[in-house]
From Swiss-Prot:
The chain crosses the membrane at residues 6-26, 54-74, 80-100, 117-137. The keyword Membrane applies. This is UPF0756 membrane protein lmo1568. Signal peptide: none annotated. Keywords: Cell membrane, Membrane, Transmembrane, Transmembrane helix. GO terms for cellular component: plasma membrane. It comes from Listeria monocytogenes serovar 1/2a (strain ATCC BAA-679 / EGD-e). It is a multi-pass membrane protein. InterPro entries: UPF0756_TM. It comes from the Bacteria.
Length: 153
């Protein structure tokens, strides 16, 4: 029962409880339950491979709700381009989307960086009350940094 992976998960659960981070607590609890109920490795692989996309879909739905309810309309979109903050927001959205795309690919080909990114994200969630969207964006930043290193060589 107390394998290395279970101890690792319990450590993250403890960190989540200390930080009072419900997202981390729920995520770790779900994974622990999957392990305890001996959920098939195939299911775990599917969740690992598709989970980020499912999460992005849920976030996208949440972002679109104000449009569906009429809280945000075309006037708001047009007005957003009348301010520096609107243009900066547009640029930041584009940059983060590109970084996330590169990050997902990089995480798939370099498992070593994935471990560091996940640990860094958990630390940020616990210590700085960050949000666990970090690994994909961090991987994109790491990808761009590695491209720069390769270019310099």
């Amino acid at each position: 029962m107390f394998t290395e992976s279970m101890l690792f998960l319990l450590l993250f659960l403890l960190l989540g409880l200390i930080a009072k981070n419900n997202s981390l607590i729920i995520a770790v609890a779900v994974v622990i339950l999957l392990k305890l109920f001996h959920v098939d490795g195939k299911v775990m692989e599917i969740i690992q491979a598709k989970g980020i996309n499912w999460g992005v879909t849920i976030i996208t739905v949440a972002i679109l709700i104000p449009i569906a309810t009429g809280q945000i309309g075309f006037k708001d979109l047009i007005d957003s381009f009348k301010s520096a903050a609107g243009w900066i927001g547009l640029g930041a959205g584009i940059a983060v989307s590109i970084l996330a795309k590169k990050g997902v690919g990089y995480m798939a080909v370099d498992p070593q960086v994935t471990v560091s990114l996940v640990f860094g994200t958990i630390l940020a969630v616990v210590l700085f009350r960050g949000i666990a969207a970090g690994p994909v964006i961090a991987a994109g930043i790491a990808y761009m940094a590695m491209q720069l290193v390769a270019f310099i060589k």
